C-alpha cells in the first residue's frame, strides 16, 4: 500500500527568521468543509499566527483562511480560531514548555497528508536583533562559497 506524498499548502518563512525553532510537532486541525476547499486552493495567510493553550486545548489564532468563492450562504468565518488535535500528554508537555520564559507556539507550515490537513507546530524562542544579523551574515557567506565553487567548477 503506497502512501501519498505530502502536499505543502503554505510555509511560514517569517517564523524561521524571527524565531529559533526548538522542537517541531505534527498535529491535526479542526476545520469546516469550505475551509478545506479553500486550503486546497492555497488561500491561506498566517505570518503573525500563534497557538495558545486554553483549558487543555490548543488553539491557533491570528491567521486567515479566505472564504471559498464557490460557496453561497454556508461559508465560514475567515478569522475564527481553529482547534488543534493533539494527545493529552503532548498538550501537557507543550504547556510546561510554553510556561518557560520566552517560548511560544508558532505554526510553521500547513500541508495535506493522505488527504488530511496537518499543521507543523514549532516550539520557538524569539531571536534578538543580533541573532538575526548573525544568521544573515552566515547565509551570505554560504552563498559566496557556493558561488566560488560553481565558478571554479567551470
From Swiss-Prot:
The cellular component terms of Gene Ontology attached to this UniProt record, alphabetical and capped at eight, are: cytosol
Task: Spell out the Gene3D superfamilies in the cross-references.
Answer: 2.40.280.10
Q: Which residues form a coiled coil?
A: none
Where does it localize? Cytoplasm
Q: Name one Pfam family in it.
A: SmpB
Q: Which GO BP terms apply? A: trans-translation
Query: Which UniProt keywords are given for this protein, alphabetically ordered?
Result: Cytoplasm, RNA-binding
Q: Give a yes or no for keyword Translocase in this entry.
A: no
Its family remark reads:
Belongs to the SmpB family.
Q: What is this protein identified as?
A: SsrA-binding protein
Q: Could you tell me which species this protein originates from?
A: Treponema denticola (strain ATCC 35405 / DSM 14222 / CIP 103919 / JCM 8153 / KCTC 15104)
Gene name of this polypeptide: smpB
Amino acid at each position: 500500500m503506497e502512501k501519498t506524498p505530502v502536499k505543502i499548502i503554505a510555509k511560514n518563512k517569517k517564523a524561521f527568521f524571527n524565531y529559533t525553532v526548538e522542537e517541531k510537532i505534527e498535529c491535526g486541525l479542526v476545520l469546516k468543509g469550505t475551509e478545506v476547499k479553500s486550503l486546497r486552493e492555497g488561500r491561506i495567510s498566517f505570518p503573525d499566527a500563534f497557538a495558545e493553550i486554553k483549558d487543555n486545548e490548543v488553539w491557533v489564532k491570528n491567521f486567515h483562511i479566505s472564504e471559498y468563492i464557490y460557496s453561497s450562504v454556508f461559508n465560514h468565518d475567515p478569522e475564527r480560531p481553529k482547534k488543534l488535535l493533539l494527545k493529552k500528554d503532548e498538550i501537557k508537555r507543550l504547556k510546561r514548555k510554553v510556561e518557560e520564559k520566552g517560548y511560544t507556539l508558532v505554526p510553521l507550515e500547513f500541508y495535506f497528508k493522505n488527504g488530511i490537513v496537518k499543521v507543523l507546530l514549532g516550539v520557538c524562542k524569539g531571536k534578538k536583533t543580533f541573532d538575526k544579523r548573525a544568521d544573515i551574515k552566515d547565509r551570505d557567506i554560504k552563498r559566496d562559497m557556493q558561488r566560488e565553487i560553481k565558478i571554479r567548477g567551470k
